[in-house]
Design a protein with these regions (language model features):
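Bacterial N-terminal signal peptides that target proteins for export
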Residues: 2-19
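Short N-terminal segments immediately surrounding and downstream of signal-peptide cleavage
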Residues: 30-49
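Divalent metal-coordination and catalytic microenvironments
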Residues: 50, 64, 74, 88, ...
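Conserved beta-strand hairpin/beta-sheet module of binuclear metal-dependent hydrolase folds
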Residues: 43-88, 187-189, 194-197
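Metallo-beta-lactamase
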Residues: 35, 46, 69-70, 77-79, 129-176, 181-182, ...
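Active-site metal-binding motif and surrounding structural segment of the metallo-beta-lactamase
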Residues: 44, 67-71, 79-123
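Accessory terminal helices/loops
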Residues: 21, 25-35, 229-231, 243-310
Length: 310
């Protein structure tokens, strides 16, 4: 059995399994309705007393449970709500009081409407509500994402930080700008020494950078750097996609992002076209380790190019 926070060797080589989940990243509601979720299993991993990670078919979920109720980070897809709640009930039968959306993408917020109708309070950064409130177009995937229904929208929003005090834990939520999107937040479970990064961290493969909605390679690097400042050698890190990680894995990920930026930027500065930059294969030395996820190297280089052109 793999050590749950071992992320080298075999763990990174099974990333294709997690790529299946990440491949749903930009699913629209209509696509979700057509997909068969019947065989998806929600797996719970205990990190510390009262803190768990749930994995299924969307972004990894973080859970704080205890006498004060359930605090949940993200809710994957609407058809999985009952399975997610059943998995949580096995941990603790208390009601889900809060859902914190890490960002606006549908594989992290798809269960919002179901949760909102159950009386759960949905919380997110200001930009998450703004983006979810209107139709959006993701040109990188040629996907139109319709505005979310009212019940799915965050009812409490913040512009920088907010803190929850639940279950004997301090849950510090902080916005990191212009990273994966323009509305990303991470959650630090202070006493438990756990961090939920959301899609600021794709563990083991190239990330999607939604530069069309405020994301950037520069912001991703800066955001990961901020998380590394508070992580210690024993910190358990829940990524947006991929297996449970540690500080060393997050540091390796940041090194990769910097190498890609440093490979693409001189070409952008020299006035090369997007196709020229992609043809130059600036990620070639990294592709064996990072290029086996849902976003292939050429697509990732294209996103980095677009980010650096701004």
């Amino acid at each position: 059995m793999l050590n749950p926070i071992q992320v080298t060797g075999t763990a990174t080589r099974i990333i294709s399994l997690f790529g299946i989940c990440a491949g749903l990243l930009m699913a629209t509601p209509s696509m979700t309705a057509a997909r068969d979720f019947s065989k998806v299993e929600i797996k719970a991993t205990k990190l510390t007393a009262g803190v768990h990670m749930l994995s299924g078919a969307g972004g990894n979920i973080g859970v704080s449970s205890g006498a004060d109720g359930i605090f949940m980070i993200d809710d994957q897809f609407a058809p999985l709500t009952d399975k997610i709640l059943a998995a949580i009930k096995k941990i603790n039968s208390a009601p889900v009081k809060f859902v914190l959306n890490n960002h606006w993408h549908f594989d992290h917020t798809g269960g919002n409407e179901n949760m909102g109708k159950k009386g759960t309070v949905i919380v997110a950064h200001d930009n998450v509500r703004k983006l979810m409130s209107a139709d959006q177009m993701i040109s990188a995937f040629n996907k139109k994402v319709p505005a979310a229904p009212q019940a799915a929208l965050p009812v409490i929003t913040f512009n920088d930080t907010t803190t929850f005090h639940m279950n004997g834990q301090t849950l510090h939520v902080r916005h990191l700008p212009s990273a994966h999107t323009g509305g990303d937040s991470f959650v630090h479970f202070v006493e438990a020494d756990v961090v939920h990064t959301g899609d600021l961290f794709f563990n083991g493969f190239y990330p999607f950078i939604d530069e069309e909605h405020g994301g950037s390679i520069t912001g991703m690097i800066a955001a990961v750097g901020e998380i590394l400042k508070l992580a210690g050698p024993n910190t358990k890190i829940i990524p947006g996609h991929g297996p449970l990680a540690d500080k060393a894995a997050l540091s390796d990920y940041r090194e990769m992002l910097m190498k890609v930026r440093d490979g693409v930027k001189p070409l952008v500065d020299a006035g090369k076209s997007k196709s020229d930059v992609i043809s130059a294969k600036p990620t070639q030395a990294l592709d064996a380790e990072w290029g086996d996820g849902f976003l292939k190297p050429d697509a990732f280089v294209g996103l980095v190019y677009a980010s650096l052109k701004k």
